[in-house]
Amino acid sequence: MELHEGYRAVAVFGGRHPAAGEREYEQACKLGALLAAAGYMVMSGGYSGVMEAVSRGASQAGGIAVGVTMEIFRGLKPNPFLSREIRTRDFFHRLEFLTTHASAFIALRGGMGTLTEMSLVWNMMQTGTIHDKPMILVGDFWRPLLRSIAGHLVIRPEDFGLFHYADTVDEAVARLTSMHSPLP
């Protein structure tokens, strides 16, 4: 399924709680604008918080924002900044769609959903089911979180090298554009 011809999609993972005016929301909004300005289409879960903010930023910058929503949340309204909504049945189908159609992944601060999304992509990278799709973890909390995971789970040291890290959204987009063209 072609989402929008001529665009590569970046899936952005992040929490559903940040509201407009809060730092995390504003950073996600900036990320969406930077990705759109660089020529990328933005994909997210399509609802509130970081998902809304990244869609808002992309849409206000003239870009494309795709929300991959879920039938199990039919009572929730998708955010108003989406160029297109793609409805999936549940979390599993949403993640399948995002991992199949995104050509890169950026993870911001979030909760269990963000950790699940990041972990799935990480596992797919580790097992070789995702190739040439970079994942950038944004924020200074990721390294200590991953060090804690390394101390408690059985994970090979080289698997921690599958990520790219960025302290800011500006750095994340600069890193992405240096290794990954927005054009297919």
Locate the predicted segments by residue.
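Glycine-rich, charge-decorated loop segments at or immediately adjacent to ligand/cofactor-binding or catalytic sites
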Residues: 48-53, 142-153
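A charged, well-structured terminal subsegment
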Residues: 100, 104, 157-184
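Short, acidic/small-residue loops that bind anionic groups at enzyme active sites
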Residues: 64-71, 108, 122-148, 157-158
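Acidic/glycine-enriched connector segments
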Residues: 26, 49-109
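Short active-site oxyanion
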Residues: 39-42, 133-134, 161-163
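Short, conserved catalytic or adaptor-binding loops enriched in Gly and charged residues
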Residues: 77-81, 152-158
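Active-site/ligand-binding-proximal alpha/beta "capping" segment
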Residues: 92-138, 182-184
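Glycine-rich beta-alpha loop segments
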Residues: 1-68
